């Protein structure tokens, strides 16, 4: 059996652009008829997506699967760590929760996770022509190298070549690329085949001889200077979301999401933010809710602690004040649970006990050990009979005596809404109906997935022009016609 061609993108730091580059390469290869699949051995994120095979993976791999034209599958991200507290994370293996670990214990637990990681990787290699692997953080962490399954430890175990990515937009890209190479031991360094300078603004000629000097000192070729793509908006797992500032200009509708400590799935608001006439920002302090037309309580990885934080920080009182003056509120997943009358945890999912909710929706939640994972396609009755799609990821069952419609719960006065559906606002007809009903704003109601697809095409175009053709040809991209 012919083994799939494999390549791993590692970065000099977190946020170097690995996720987007893998997504762009997936789209580029798929456009040229290459059967390509993404893979990330270990991910740490509370932004997760439900897969077609009934599990969950990081949103980054969901995006990369979309770029490759594939349904997301749990093999694409076999180990997902979802932080619940400062030093504790839920461990998801091949799509399903296997337990919880403290940070110290995870070091010892990594090596037993390597077999399922390799099992998932090998299945993808058997099914596709190319498998593009994304690393995590930086490989130049000598304290983490032993037992590593996220970067060079995986690359060694699976015998995968590496391209190293540095972000010039942060500054110091040449030092970070060369420094990363210097920190690697000889065997790991030999695995690095190429360097990429990412997110450059301006003409590459401005770099002068610096790339050549980097090649000479590091012994590894620079195969591309990738420009920053103007106004590129793709879902990101760990993007530095925009904190609340002064009210936007031009009379835009102000949507403010509460950024509690264990917030999850902040990208649920991307489709709203893409609407003309809508401005989305995030708030951590009560005063930052001032001027909001709509307040959103997003998902939460630990509902009890985030609910307590709302009260202790003064956010709850600011939310009540917003409602008294006619403001609108939406709660998604954990946000829905917090907006209800109360939450019970009889089986200790979050430590046990109970807590009163904010009392803004006539619902009550009981947490349960079994996690609900489902892709959802259906119809909402309010604010209009329209189709909705999304997915559910939650521990808990929420019931109501009244005010509960298919997919949404609504307060008696119609100003507070809650739903378990992540990506609810991606449903264009629902989003437009809500903006009209609440704010008389004629939203565009565009297809969010179509918007993302167009952005992926822009990114793929950029990579095809920026990376050296010979290196792309080795992955299956035909040479560009000469001009």
From Swiss-Prot:
<dbReference type="InterPro" id="IPR047045">
    <property type="entry name" value="CobQ_N"/>
</dbReference>
<dbReference type="InterPro" id="IPR029062">
    <property type="entry name" value="Class_I_gatase-like"/>
</dbReference>
<protein>
    <recommendedName>
        <fullName>Cobyric acid synthase</fullName>
    </recommendedName>
</protein>
<dbReference type="InterPro" id="IPR027417">
    <property type="entry name" value="P-loop_NTPase"/>
</dbReference>
<dbReference type="GO" id="GO:0015420">
    <property type="term" value="F:ABC-type vitamin B12 transporter activity"/>
</dbReference>
<dbReference type="InterPro" id="IPR011698">
    <property type="entry name" value="GATase_3"/>
</dbReference>
<comment type="function">
    <text>Catalyzes amidations at positions B, D, E, and G on adenosylcobyrinic A,C-diamide. NH(2) groups are provided by glutamine, and one molecule of ATP is hydrogenolyzed for each amidation.</text>
</comment>
<dbReference type="Pfam" id="PF07685">
    <property type="entry name" value="GATase_3"/>
</dbReference>
<feature type="active site" description="Nucleophile">
    <location>
        <position position="333"/>
    </location>
</feature>
<dbReference type="InterPro" id="IPR002586">
    <property type="entry name" value="CobQ/CobB/MinD/ParA_Nub-bd_dom"/>
</dbReference>
<feature type="active site">
    <location>
        <position position="422"/>
    </location>
</feature>
<dbReference type="InterPro" id="IPR033949">
    <property type="entry name" value="CobQ_GATase1"/>
</dbReference>
<dbReference type="InterPro" id="IPR004459">
    <property type="entry name" value="CobQ_synth"/>
</dbReference>
<dbReference type="Pfam" id="PF01656">
    <property type="entry name" value="CbiA"/>
</dbReference>
<feature type="domain" description="GATase cobBQ-type">
    <location>
        <begin position="252"/>
        <end position="430"/>
    </location>
</feature>
<comment type="pathway">
    <text>Cofactor biosynthesis; adenosylcobalamin biosynthesis.</text>
</comment>
<comment type="similarity">
    <text>Belongs to the CobB/CobQ family. CobQ subfamily.</text>
</comment>
<dbReference type="GO" id="GO:0009236">
    <property type="term" value="P:cobalamin biosynthetic process"/>
</dbReference>
<keyword id="KW-0315">Glutamine amidotransferase</keyword>
<dbReference type="GO" id="GO:0003824">
    <property type="term" value="F:catalytic activity"/>
</dbReference>
<keyword id="KW-0169">Cobalamin biosynthesis</keyword>
């Amino acid at each position: 059996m012919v083994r799939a061609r494999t390549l791993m993108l590692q970065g000099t730091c977190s946020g170097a652009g690995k996720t987007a580059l893998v997504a762009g390469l997936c789209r580029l290869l798929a456009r040229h008829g290459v059967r390509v699949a993404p893979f990330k051995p270990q991910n740490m994120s509370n932004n997760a997506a439900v897969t077609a095979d009934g599990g969950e993976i990081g949103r980054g791999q969901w995006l990369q699967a979309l770029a490759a034209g594939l349904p997301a599958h749990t093999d694409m991200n076999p180990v997902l760590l979802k932080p619940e507290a400062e030093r504790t994370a839920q461990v998801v293996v091949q799509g399903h929760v296997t337990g919880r670990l403290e940070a110290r214990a995870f070091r010892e637990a990594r090596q037993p996770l390597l077999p399922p990681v390799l099992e998932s990787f090998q299945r993808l290699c058997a099914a596709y022509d190319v498998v593009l692997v994304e690393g995590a953080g930086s490989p130049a962490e000598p304290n983490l190298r032993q037992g590593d399954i996220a970067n060079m430890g995986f690359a060694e175990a699976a015998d995968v070549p590496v391209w190293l990515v540095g972000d010039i937009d942060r500054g110091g890209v040449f030092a970070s690329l060369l420094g990363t190479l210097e920190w690697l031991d000889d065997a790991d360094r030999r695995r690095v085949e190429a360097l990429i300078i990412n997110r450059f603004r301006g003409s590459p000629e401005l770099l002068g001889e610096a790339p050549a000097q980097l090649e000479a000192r590091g012994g590894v070729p620079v195969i591309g200077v990738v420009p920053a793509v103007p106004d590129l908006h793709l879902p990101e797992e760990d993007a530095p979301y925009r904190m609340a500032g002064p009210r936007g200009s031009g009379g835009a509708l102000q949507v403010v999401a509460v950024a509690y400590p264990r917030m999850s799935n902040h990208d649920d608001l991307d489709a709203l933010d893409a609407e003309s006439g809508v401005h989305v920002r995030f708030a951590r302090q009560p005063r930052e809710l001032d001027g909001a037309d709509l307040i959103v309580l997003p998902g939460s990885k630990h509902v009890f602690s985030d609910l307590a934080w709302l009260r202790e920080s003064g956010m709850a009182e600011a939310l009540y004040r917003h409602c008294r003056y006619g403001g609108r509120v939406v709660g998604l997943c954990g946000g829905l649970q917090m907006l209800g009358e109360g939450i019970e945890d009889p089986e200790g999912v979050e430590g046990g006990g109970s807590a009163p909710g904010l009392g803004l929706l006539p619902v009550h939640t009981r947490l349960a050990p079994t996690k609900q994972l489902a892709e959802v396609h259906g119809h909402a009755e309010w604010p209009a009979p329209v189709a909705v799609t999304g997915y559910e990821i939650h521990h808990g069952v929420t019931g109501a005596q009244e005010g509960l419609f298919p997919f949404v719960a609504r307060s008696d006065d119609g100003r507070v809404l809650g739903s378990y559906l992540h990506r609810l606002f991606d449903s264009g007809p629902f989003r437009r109906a809500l903006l009209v009903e609440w704010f008389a704003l004629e939203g565009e109601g565009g297809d969010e997935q179509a918007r993302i697809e167009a952005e992926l095409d822009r990114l793929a175009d950029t990579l095809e022009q920026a990376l050296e053709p010979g290196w792309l040809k080795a992955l299956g991209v035909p040479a560009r016609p000469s001009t």
